[in-house]
Amino acid sequence: LFECVLSCDIKKNGKPCKPKGEKKCSGGWRCKINFCLKV
């Protein structure tokens, strides 16, 4: 896994990567390719 360089508005299962749709991939979120994972 790596810190997402794209904004965390990538969606998984039709829902925002982060609950409030924040643009930063901080707070435990990591993106792998186009998958958003909370770690």
UniProtKB/Swiss-Prot annotation:
- Subcellular localization, per the record? Secreted
User: Disulphide bridges in this chain?
Assistant: C4-C25, C8-C31, C17-C36
One molecular function GO term is: toxin activity
Tree of life domain: Eukaryota
Which keywords appear in this protein's UniProt record, sorted alphabetically?
A: Calcium channel impairing toxin, Disulfide bond, Ion channel impairing toxin, Neurotoxin, Secreted, Toxin, Voltage-gated calcium channel impairing toxin
Protein task: Toxin that inhibits voltage-gated calcium channels in rat cerebellar granule cells (IC(50)<200 nM). Is lethal to cockroaches.
Task: State the Pfam families in the record.
Answer: Toxin_20
UniProt protein name: Omega-theraphotoxin-Asp1a
Would you identify the family this protein belongs to, as annotated? Belongs to the neurotoxin 12 (Hwtx-2) family. 06 (TXP1) subfamily.
Which GO cellular component terms, listed alphabetically, does the Swiss-Prot or TrEMBL entry include?
A: extracellular region
Principal localisation: secreted
> What SUPFAM superfamilies does the entry give?
omega toxin-like
According to its UniProt entry, this protein's organism is Aphonopelma sp.
The reply on keyword Secreted is: yes
| Tissue localization of expression | Expressed by the venom gland.
